[in-house]
Amino acid sequence: MKALWAVLLVTLLTGCLAEGEPEVADELAWQSNQPWEQALNRFWDYLRWVQTLSDQVQEELQSSQVTQELTVLMEDTMTEVKAYKKELEEQLGPVAEETRARLAKEVQAAQARLGADMEDLRNRLGQYRNEVHTMLGQSSEEIRARLSTHLRKMRKRLMRDAEDLQKRLAVYKSGAREGAERGVSAIRERLGPLVEQGRQRTANLGAGAAQPLRDRAQALGDRIRGRLEEVGNQARDRLEEVREHMEEVRSKMEEQTQQIRLQAEIFQARLKGWFEPLLEDMQRQWANLVEKIQASVATNPITSTPMPEEN
């Protein structure tokens, strides 16, 4: 395992020189001490190494080693996410049941999206291994190019899923902090003077009446914001698919043009191979004919016939 991480480190250093700022941005976005984010960092590192499609990656993709490593990293990440979510649930405290259910549902949905896309990535790598083994009328370069395109697309999707989950957990954590603060305030009220207790009780009654309205407004705002984010993500995915389709069409056209050019060159070479011997044979025959005529003239010179005299 240490050797694998050493290879990953060298690959990452090489990738940073080649890809520049986008990789640095990914690293900066995940500087955190939460265990689930650290597990996700390990998943990112391994995915970056797979994306290099180096000779070692190609060799390990032929076996089940890559998918096994991804499975372990995926399970570690999702286990840490579940543990962190459970920890926040225990800290959530006395919040409205509607708010608790909404926050839990949002976190669960974001967690499910991340897990499903990780599973899709693992299945795609398994499909690549099968395609390489069968090679059904395709070249290895075509299969590798298609895998590289799919990995880039999946990496973007996974990054969006991870960012969305991070936001949802941050909201969940904020609710837990508010619940803890309310618990501390309740203890302070019970230990305070009786007059202060009455004043705080009156203030809490007013806040309790306004709380459902605030919860409904927040829920509506969250639903609208979530819908806008979903529409934006769908639009970005569609644009990305169109761009990738255009790139595939352009690549296929270039490949077909190259094939036509090669076929024309082959046909030209065949024509040349057919006609050159024929021309050479005709030239030899013509030269032989000329030589025979010249030889005949030399051995049988033409004598001039005298003209008859006129009377």
Curated annotation (Swiss-Prot):
It comes from the Eukaryota. GO terms for biological process: acylglycerol homeostasis; cholesterol efflux; cholesterol metabolic process; lipoprotein metabolic process; melanosome organization; phospholipid efflux. The keyword Disulfide bond does not apply. Sequence repeats lie at residues 72-93, 94-115, 116-137, 138-159, 160-181, 182-203, 204-225, 226-247. Residues 72-247 are annotated as: 8 X 22 AA approximate tandem repeats. Residues 150-160 are annotated as: LDL and other lipoprotein receptors binding. Residues 202-282 are annotated as: Lipid-binding and lipoprotein association. Residues 258-311 are annotated as: Homooligomerization. Residues 1-18 form the signal peptide. Gene3D superfamilies: Apolipoprotein. Residues 270-282 are annotated as: Specificity for association with VLDL. Its main location: secreted. APOE is an apolipoprotein, a protein associating with lipid particles, that mainly functions in lipoprotein-mediated lipid transport between organs via the plasma and interstitial fluids. APOE is a core component of plasma lipoproteins and is involved in their production, conversion and clearance. Apolipoproteins are amphipathic molecules that interact both with lipids of the lipoprotein particle core and the aqueous environment of the plasma. Belongs to the apolipoprotein A1/A4/E family. This is Apolipoprotein E. It comes from Mastomys coucha.
